Amino acid sequence: MSLGAGPEAGFSSEELLTLRFPLHRACRDGDLPALCALLQSAPRSDLAAEDSFYGWTPIHWAAHFGKLECLMQLVRAGASVNASTTRFAQTPAHIAAFGGHPQCLNWLIQVGANINKQDYVGETPIHKAARSGSVDSISALVAHGAQIDLRNASGLTAADLAHTQGFQECAQFLLNLQNCHLNRYYSNGTLNGGHRNAGPNPFSGGTSRKRSFEDVESAGVKKARTEAYSFDGLIPMMNGGVEDDADNMHVDREFAVVSDMNSSSSILNALTNGCAMNGHLDFTAAQQLSGMDTRQEECLTLAPNGIIPGVTSPSRHRIHTSNGTEEPEKAMNNPTDMCGSLHLNGSPSSCVSNRPSWVEDPGDTLHYGHYHGFGDTAESIPELSSVVEHSNSVKVEQRYDNTVLGTMYLYHGS
């Protein structure tokens, strides 16, 4: 009996399939016992016989109808997983993809099916899956390395075919996969946190050359803040010098918000309008200042020589006179012992003018801080170097005259 002959007159398709192609019929129906019995008696050539209806072999029939057990039996009996039909050059993978059977596809791939083989119109299994809108089959193929950008003989990709057939969801899925495939070089690039050597993003909170607030706090020394209320000119002084790092050119501590600049009741007014006495700020003298432009005296800035007018180095205290000269006073003791003067003029937390003997020697970190035993306002200002950065010299020069005038006014009342 010639299996390749055309349908005979007087026989229906079902009768002809049962009589002339029993292996094909068993694979179509998933009749595993009948298939096993036929495989034991049928010659090996029957495994590659093509029917007269579609030109398929038994393994193509099993793949089209999703009969995984039949596929296994056929391959075990010697059928090729890459068997190509004579008429359309299609493999079982093409047929399983078009039928929408991802389980059969996965198994065929595992036993060696070529998922990128093109048929007579240049289509691979993923094109067939797109034609039928089988997203599951597409996913199975892509997971095993199927090429989604291949074009058929008409120049169409799988996404184009899905769109043409009206499977918009499938088409969009393929387009997304195609974009990911074309842009996969971004996987270690800018879209996924790449270019790590290009420097931190200032808007992402990345690490920069500035030390973090937590690092400074852990060391017991507060760090400068740039967002303080216009205190960009207020530079912490230590041993008559300043640090060359621009990060330390701003006030560290966040001062209290000033609701009324004329009340002179907040710490901010004392710091911005007060005078320097014995290396500390005097609140009483600060309250005497009125009628002056608070905006111009908003910041106490460095003089060009690196010293705030009225504030001297730790070893020697000087006061500016009305003619602009400096009048030396007696030498001061170790400034670390004078760490309570800030609260000796009306502060409710005023306790001691000298550092208590039971407090450990803070070294150089409390030269301009204060200690009152409660720990709620004690500050420690980090030691600074002796070089003023050139970038801030212009701003310092502009505010220097205002600071000198304010200091003279406080001392002489003129």
Curated annotation (Swiss-Prot):
InterPro entries assigned to the protein according to its UniProt record, in alphabetical order: Ank_Repeat/CDKN_Inhibitor, Ankyrin_rpt, Ankyrin_rpt-contain_sf
Gene Ontology molecular-function annotations: chloroplast targeting sequence binding
Residue stretches of each ANK repeat: 18-47, 54-83, 88-117, 121-150, 154-187
PROSITE patterns named in the record: ANK_REP_REGION (PS50297), ANK_REPEAT (PS50088)
Entry keyword set: ANK repeat, Repeat
One annotated GO biological process: protein targeting to chloroplast
Highest taxon of the lineage: Eukaryota
Keyword Repeat in annotation: yes
SMART domains to which the protein is assigned, alphabetical: ANK
Protein name: Ankyrin repeat domain-containing protein 10
Source organism (scientific name): Gallus gallus
UniProt lineage: Eukaryota, Metazoa, Chordata, Craniata, Vertebrata
